[in-house]
Amino acid sequence: MAGTALKRLMAEYKQLTLNPPEGIVAGPMNEENFFEWEALIMGPEDTCFEFGVFPAILSFPLDYPLSPPKMRFTCEMFHPNIYPDGRVCISILHAPGDDPMGYESSAERWSPVQSVEKILLSVVSMLAEPNDESGANVDASKMWRDDREQFYKVAKQIVQKSLGL
């Protein structure tokens, strides 16, 4: 199974290298291990995360693409759909099948036709438009709902930290 996963990851890396999505850089951390990738995601334009540069790690299972990777930001993040430890909570990264909580349709969840590029683009969209109905960070979700101005201030501080300011 790992051979199939490796071939798929190599093909996806080649595609990302030849035609990278705007504002995203991603690839294996080293040539010996194609199952751990690092990514740099630029904050989406016209959002409170604009100008930020956010590093993340994608960890792929040996049965990829049957199972989704896990994604974790390695910098400080404050967002309704990112756990305090950096783990990303987004439908496309959830295993196939029905959502026991009833928030997601099976079509929104992982399937083998998804790709690293689709994951990263979904995360950029998530940064721009948080889903506060299934919050991974309760404090960020509450602030997003109740005090948007304060949320923007905190996000701007995160952006400055991401730039080393």
Curated annotation (Swiss-Prot):
Subcellular location field: Endoplasmic reticulum; Lipid droplet
Any single Gene Ontology cellular-component annotation: lipid droplet
Keyword Isomerase attached: no
Name of one Pfam family that matches: UQ_con
Statement: the UniProt record of this protein carries the keyword Cytoplasm: no
Pathway: Protein modification; protein ubiquitination
Protein name per UniProt: Ubiquitin-conjugating enzyme E2 G2
Domain of life: Eukaryota
N-acetylalanine modifications at: A2
The entry's keywords: Acetylation, ATP-binding, Endoplasmic reticulum, Lipid droplet, Nucleotide-binding, Transferase, Ubl conjugation pathway
InterPro entries in the record: Ub_conjugating_enzyme, UBQ-conjugat_E2_core, UBQ-conjugating_AS, UBQ-conjugating_enzyme/RWD
Broadest EC class assigned to this enzyme: transferase
Purpose: Accepts ubiquitin from the E1 complex and catalyzes its covalent attachment to other proteins. In vitro catalyzes 'Lys-48'-linked polyubiquitination. Involved in endoplasmic reticulum-associated degradation (ERAD). Required for sterol-induced ubiquitination of 3-hydroxy-3-methylglutaryl coenzyme A reductase and its subsequent proteasomal degradation.
Catalytic activity, reaction form: S-ubiquitinyl-[E1 ubiquitin-activating enzyme]-L-cysteine + [E2 ubiquitin-conjugating enzyme]-L-cysteine = [E1 ubiquitin-activating enzyme]-L-cysteine + S-ubiquitinyl-[E2 ubiquitin-conjugating enzyme]-L-cysteine
Family in the record: Belongs to the ubiquitin-conjugating enzyme family.
Oligomer status and interactors: Interacts with AUP1 (via C-terminus); the interaction recruits UBE2G2 to lipid droplets. Interacts with ubiquitin ligases AMFR/gp78 and RNF139/TRC8; recruitment to lipid droplets by AUP1 facilitates interaction of UBE2G2 with AMFR and RNF139, leading to sterol-induced ubiquitination of 3-hydroxy-3-methylglutaryl coenzyme A reductase and its subsequent proteasomal degradation.
Any GO BP: protein K48-linked ubiquitination
Gene Ontology MF term list: ATP binding; ubiquitin conjugating enzyme activity; ubiquitin-protein transferase activity
Domain spans labelled UBC core: 4-164
Annotated EC: 2.3.2.23
Chief localization: endoplasmic reticulum
Record-annotated active site: C89
Species the sequence originates in: Bos taurus
